[in-house]
Design a protein with these regions (language model features):
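N-terminal secretory signal peptides
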Residues: 1-2
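A structural boundary/capping signal
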Residues: 5-290
Length: 290
C-alpha cells in the first residue's frame, strides 16, 4: 500500500539521525507511524461548485475545466482531459519528496498539459505561442496558483500525502508540495525547458528556476542562497523571486544545489514534529558532508 511504503521510507530516513534525532521521542515516531498508515485516497477529491476548477466524469476519465487570472490580470480558460486509468495508476505509486520531484519532471501528462497551455488564448488576443516568454511564464504560474490550497489532512485524511501531477490536475487542489511539483512539471517540459528546483523552507516548499533560463524581464529578480536559482511561490501571488521570510534550508535541482546545515540543526525539531518535512531534509543531507 502506498501509505505503508511511505511509512517504511520515512522511518528509514528518520534513522539517519540528520535532523536532530535527539529531539524525537519514541512516542512521536509511533504517532507518525499510525497517522501515515491511515486511509489513502481512492477517488478524486470533491470539487466545490464555486471553485475556479470544474470536473466532469466521462466514460473513460475526467474532463477538467480550469479558469484563472494571472498577476497582470489576464483571464484564461483551459479544457483538459485525463484518463481514469492514468489517475488510478498515479495514485497507486508511492513517492517521497525527491522521487515526486523527478516524477513531475518526467510526467507525460505534464508534457501534454504544457502543449495544451501553449494553444490557450484570451478572447481578442493572440494565441499563447506568439506572446512574449515572460507572459507565457506568468500564465503557467497563474494556472498553478489557481488550484485551491488544502492541507493533506483536509483533502485526504492523512497528515502527509504526496500527489502526482495527474492527481493534482484531477483533484483540483493541493498543498505547497503538490503545487510545486505541478509547476516544476510544466516548466521542465520542452515548451520551456527550464532547469527547475524545489526549495525547502521550514514547513514550506516552493519552486525555483535557474536564473539563466528566465526571460530577460526577470534579470533583476533576487536569487536564492547559492546564487543559481530564483524562487517562485506556488500558493501565494508573490512576484517571481519573492518568497516568505523564512530561512532557506535546501535547494534541490540537479542534485543538491544548496543546503544550510546550521539552519537545519537550529530548526530541526520543527521538522520532526511535522512529518511533511523530515524525510526531505534527511534525503537532502544524506549525500552531503555534515
Amino acid at each position: 500500500m502506498k501509505r505503508r511504503e511511505l511509512l517504511d521510507n520515512a522511518l528509514d530516513r528518520a534513522a539517519l539521525g540528520v535532523v536532530v534525532s535527539s529531539a524525537v521521542e519514541l512516542s512521536d515516531l509511533w504517532s507518525v507511524a499510525l497517522s501515515l498508515s491511515a486511509s489513502e485516497p481512492t477517488r478524486p477529491t470533491p470539487i466545490d461548485a464555486e471553485d475556479s476548477i470544474s470536473r466532469e466524469r466521462t466514460a473513460d476519465g475526467y474532463a477538467m475545466t480550469y479558469e484563472w487570472t494571472d498577476r497582470p490580470g489576464r483571464k484564461w480558460c483551459l479544457e483538459f482531459s485525463i484518463e481514469r486509468s492514468a489517475y488510478r495508476e498515479a495514485a497507486d505509486k508511492a513517492h517521497g519528496y525527491l522521487s515526486g520531484f523527478e516524477a513531475a519532471k518526467a510526467s507525460s501528462h505534464a508534457e501534454r498539459l504544457t502543449e495544451a497551455l501553449a494553444d490557450v488564448s484570451v478572447t481578442g488576443e493572440r494565441a499563447w505561442r506568439s506572446l512574449p516568454e515572460s507572459v507565457r511564464l506568468e500564465r503557467a504560474i497563474g494556472f498553478v496558483r489557481s488550484f485551491k490550497y488544502v492541507t493533506d489532512a483536509e483533502s485526504t485524511g492523512a497528515p502527509e500525502y504526496i500527489r502526482t501531477v495527474e492527481e493534482t490536475l484531477v483533484d483540483g487542489c493541493g498543498d505547497c508540495e503538490d503545487l510545486t511539483y505541478l509547476l516544476v512539471g510544466i516548466l521542465s517540459q520542452p515548451a520551456f525547458s527550464y532547469r527547475t528546483a524545489m526549495v525547502i523552507l521550514p514547513g514550506h516548499m516552493l519552486a525555483a528556476v535557474h536564473r539563466d533560463d528566465l526571460p530577460a524581464a526577470y534579470a533583476d529578480a533576487p536569487t536564492l542562497p547559492g546564487g543559481a536559482y530564483v524562487a517562485i511561490e506556488c500558493t501565494t501571488s508573490r512576484p517571481i523571486g519573492d518568497f516568505q521570510d523564512e530561512p532557506v534550508l535546501a535547494v534541490y535541482g540537479d542534485g543538491i544545489e544548496y543546503i544550510d546545515q546550521s539552519s537545519i540543526t537550529d530548526t530541526g525539531w520543527r521538522f520532526v514534529q511535522d512529518p511533511t518535512q523530515f524525510q526531505t531534509i534527511a534525503d537532502a543531507s544524506e549525500g552531503r558532508p555534515h
